[in-house]
Amino acid sequence: MKTYSFFVLFIVFIFFISSSKSHSKKHVRFLCATKAVKHIRKVCPDMCLTGEEVEVNEFCKMGYSDSQIKYICCPE
């Protein structure tokens, strides 16, 4: 009986772990925003010289190409 109970609890535990999310949405947005800012600084080292801000949330949702970032931030 103890073995059967342990086995059932073990299966329920595994099911619970597999169905839970590994990261919250807030954590994922934070990671994306951090990576986006680092990438923008790599493309435009002086950040936005035009005074125009690259919308980090849009960068995370849609993705900007390097040429779009240069056009917005540091046109030549």
UniProtKB/Swiss-Prot annotation:
Residues 1-24 form the signal peptide. This is Probable insulin-like peptide alpha-type 1. Disulfide bonds join C32-C60, C44-C73, C48-C74. GO terms for cellular component: extracellular region. Keywords: Disulfide bond, Secreted, Signal. Belongs to the insulin family. The gene is ins-21. The lineage of its organism: Eukaryota, Metazoa, Ecdysozoa, Nematoda, Chromadorea. It comes from the Eukaryota.
